Amino acid sequence: MHARVARYGIDPDKMVDALEALRDAGREVADLEGYKGGHVLVDYDDGTLITLTLWENRAAIDRSEVRAAQLRQRALRSVDGEVQSVTCYEVPFELG
């Protein structure tokens, strides 16, 4: 399994709108081949938002890269947010 972690900077006053826009984008991401799930992490005080999406394998995460970037940009455009970083990782095991 592989994970893509994206970190965003959002105006804290626009966080609720950003979450709504990312929820909509997430529905489209979920339709991409090899998608296995995802999570959103948020710090309402400082405007940090992180998305973590899980993918079946390296090929799936690579295939999704362009579309995922388009969806991120579309979601952030509505709230003047910025993508601070996007990094992919291998997931060797699940805790627990």
Q: What are the functions of these language-model segments?
A:
Residues 1-49, 56-69, 76-96:
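Short S/T/G/P-rich N-terminal loop/turn motif that feeds into the first structured element of a domain
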